[in-house]
């Protein structure tokens, strides 16, 4: 499955997730949605989010090293409202590359971090938010 096909499958499942009639059907669709996220195929240029506990950093995939190892860089951002959590995500990349490895559970975790409490990568959306309470 290619990267484009895997993201199309996720969008299809997300569309079906909006129309459910029973709780069992919703649960089955949520499981299918989670599976589609785990099966996403990374590609250079895909927008993603690095999740640091309560903070989110917008990033872009810069290299696919292997099928289970990728490099990402932060996107530049413009702060519109720090305490309101509003940021403009710019296309320019900044900072050094960070390596993420896909674990057996399907999650992308920063190289050298534990699966349980490690820094995660979300391939299915791009968001930037710095928690002002820390």
Q: Language-model features: where?
A:
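Mixed-charge, low-complexity intrinsically disordered regions
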Residues: 1-58, 69, 74-134
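Residue-level recognition of beta-strand termini and adjacent short loop/turns
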Residues: 65-66
């Amino acid at each position: 499955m290619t990267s484009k096909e895997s993201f199309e499958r996720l969008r299809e499942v997300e569309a079906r997730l909006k129309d459910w009639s029973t709780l069992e059907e919703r649960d089955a669709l949520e499981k299918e949605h989670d599976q589609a996220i785990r099966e996403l195929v990374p590609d250079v240029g895909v927008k993603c989010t690095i999740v640091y506990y309560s903070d989110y950093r917008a990033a872009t995939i810069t290299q696919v090293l292997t099928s289970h190892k990728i490099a990402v860089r932060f996107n530049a951002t413009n702060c519109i409202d720090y305490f309101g959590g509003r940021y403009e995500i710019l296309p320019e990349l900044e900072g050094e590359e960070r390596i993420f490895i896909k674990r057996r559970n399907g999650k992308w975790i920063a190289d050298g971090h534990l699966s349980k409490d490690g820094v995660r990568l979300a391939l299915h959306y791009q968001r930037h938010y710095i928690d002002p309470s820390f």
